[in-house]
Structures are given as structure tokens and as C-alpha cells.
Amino acid sequence: MPAPLKGSFESLARQNEKTEEDGLERILDEQDLQDRIDHKMLVPVPVSASLSINNNLAETHRYVRPWTATFLGDLSKAHAQRFDGPIQVTSAVRTVDYQKQLMHVNGNATQAEGDVVSPHLTGATIDIGKNTMTRAELAWMRNFLLPLQLDGKIDVEEEFRQACFHITVYKSYAPPLSPAAPVIAARKARSKAGAQVASTDDPQ
């Protein structure tokens, strides 16, 4: 069994630094959150047969950054190739106001204000529940996540009181397409279509 991916204050500080480098701001309240949803800065958690979400989360708290959604899609598809049943997102975006409330009921909750705060406030972070995972699934998750952490694409803190994988995904996980990428893709599509037409026209 691979060792747990334990967190540390250094890891939390790094998550704050890197999300700031990614240009992400802390989401203050529900109005601020709704504005970012309306402007497509946050997208829905990509729920599917292989990825579920905690039904207790408010509708507006079921959103993440686009690259975090891409990561969740990749993770859930890879998990589904090995195991039955979906993985579950137990927490996604939070606001500063919500985090303050959480601190009153959860002694494990990270600060809402200051230099080092919960990266959930940026929308880049999700929690994946561990309660229903088998030992084989836990081992698989650790083996899947560790290389991405070593590559600087994510940071992981395996929590035990809340029984989850706390994962912050960085923008570099799914960098935006370059301006030329759509043009190149269109050329490739046209070239492929032309080749198919030529093949159809060939005499038998």
C-alpha cells in the first residue's frame, strides 16, 4: 500500500502562492460567486456515471475552475476503467463568508482570511471523498495523484478527519489553446476530409 499523501503547512502555503501566480482571487460572497459563474470563470463539476457530487452542496457551490473540471473528467474516467462505482466530489468552490461559517463548526477548517487560507476560495480545489473507497482504490488514487504532484500540476493533502483527498489543480494542468491551435485543428480536419473523398473517388 502506498503511503498516504499527507499535507503540511508548507503545502498549504504553496497552494496559496501558486493559485495567486495563476491570477486567482478569493471569492468573497454569494454575489461574487454568482458573478464569476455568469462570466464563465467557473464551470459546473462534470457529473457523470463515473463522477458524483455531494447532494448537500448548494447549487452554486458545485462549480470549479475549467482546468479543475478537466482534471476531474480525466480522474473519473481513469478510475472507471479499474473500478465500479463513481468517485464523489464532497466539496468544491467556497466563498470567504462560507469558510468563516465552516470554521465555527469544523475545527479542521482552514482560515478564511490572511496570507494562508483555504484554496477552495479560488475555485481551483476539490475534495474527493474516501469513505466508500476500498484499499485497492486508495492505493490507486495515491499512485495516480503522486506523479501529477511531483510534476507541479496539482497539490494533494490526504485528510483523515474529513476522510478526503484535498486536491488543488493548477492552470498548467490544462493550459489554454494557443491562438493558432484552432486554425491548425481546422486544417487537419479539412486534410482528413479531403483524403477520405479522394479514397472514395478511386476506381475499384
What are these regions (language model features)?
Residues M1-L72, P147, E157-A163, T168-A189, ...:
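Extracytoplasmic cell-surface/polysaccharide-interacting catalytic and binding patches
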Residues L57, H61-L72, A92-T95, P119-L121, ...:
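Solvent-exposed, acidic/flexible segments
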Residues E59-T60, G73-A78, E113-G114:
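Short secondary-structure capping micro-motifs at structural edges
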Residues A69-G73, K77, K100, A139, ...:
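Solvent-exposed, polar/charged alpha-helical surfaces in well-ordered, non-transmembrane soluble domains
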Residues K77-D84, Y98, G107, L146, ...:
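Sec-exported extracytoplasmic/periplasmic mature domains
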Residues G85-L102:
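Acidic helix-start/capping segments at beta-turn-to-alpha-helix junctions
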Residues D97-E113:
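Charged, often glycine-rich, active-site loop that binds/positions anionic groups
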Residues T110-Q204:
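Catalytic cores and adjacent binding grooves of peptidoglycan-active enzymes
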